[in-house]
Amino acid sequence: DRDRLLIAMMAETGLRLGEILGIHYTEDIDFERRTVRVRYRESNTNLARAKNAEYRIALLSNTTFEFLVKYISDNRKSLMNSEYLFTKLTGKNKGEPLDADSVYSMLKRLSKKTDINSHPHQLRHYFAEERRKEGWDLNDIRFALGHKKVETTIKYLGENNERLIEATDQYYS
């Protein structure tokens, strides 16, 4: 459940791996608004960081939010010993904050099972592409991804997309 939630949240919010791993479930989740806050913290013991010392908010769908609430409820005992949403659930390091290496290992195992090569950053690209299909403005996608420049966002959406070229022209006109 933890891994599915992590993947769902990354695909749905466009958050970077470090941003997801840095979520403190007691401070960063607004249960009334179904949002997750991204905060830059130097103190994260798993070295997870929000890039560019930024702060922003990501909205979760009803489905993912319900999954999140169930995950917290099902894992309350192990989460009580940690402020992090995502922790190691087994082994000698049980209860410690999940780190990037663990996520890469999990995705590698998933890739072997499914024959689909996956990487955390691909989920950010997926987020950007899906939001574009939904008609999001280029600047809104840029903001959601935490990009400073719209040119970076454009790279996430592919270079030969005519709709993207039109959107870029509109953005700069």
Model regions and ranges:
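Conserved catalytic core of the tyrosine transesterase superfamily
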Residues: 1-173
